[in-house]
């Protein structure tokens, strides 16, 4: 029997928790949809090497480890009819050697255009 690949650890920054709490008021299924995204899309991308063109590494940062990624294809059931093009964005750090991801930021593209680079730099530089 084969086991399903997962990450050894999934952590959340306090700022991420605040983002999630705020967005969860508008998008009721967000917590559950986030868990599904981590178990499927992120595991496929990092653990099994399958790219669905929904996860992109953020470039132009002054460090390489951890690698910082943005998820653009994020299906949210609360946004009916939009599928993976919901407009939600997830920023996370991937610590390859530790088999760990750390959730940095989540936002709705209609509210904010790009990731908070200052947050990324203050936590990982």
Positions of predicted regions on the chain:
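A short, surface-exposed loop/turn module that caps and links secondary-structure elements
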Residues: 43-80
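A broad, low-specificity signal marking well-ordered, structured residues that form hydrophobic/aromatic
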Residues: 10, 68-69, 101
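Residue-level signal for alpha-helical context at structural boundaries
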Residues: 34-41, 52, 56, 109
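Amphipathic alpha-helical interface surfaces
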Residues: 12, 30, 34, 67, ...
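Enriched for short, Lys/Arg-rich terminal
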Residues: 2-7, 75-125
């Amino acid at each position: 029997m084969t086991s399903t690949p997962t990450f050894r650890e999934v952590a959340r920054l306090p700022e991420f928790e605040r983002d999630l709490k705020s967005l969860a008021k508008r998008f009721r299924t967000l917590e559950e949809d986030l868990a599904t995204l981590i178990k499927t899309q992120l595991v496929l991308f990092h653990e099994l090497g399958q790219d669905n063109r929904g996860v992109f590494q953020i470039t132009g940062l002054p460090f390489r480890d951890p690698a910082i990624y943005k998820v653009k294809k994020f299906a949210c059931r609360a946004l009916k009819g939009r599928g993976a093009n919901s407009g939600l964005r997830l920023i996370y750090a991937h610590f390859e050697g530790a088999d760990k991801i750390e959730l940095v930021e989540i936002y709705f593209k209609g509210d904010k255009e790009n990731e908070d680079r200052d947050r990324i730099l203050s936590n990982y530089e």
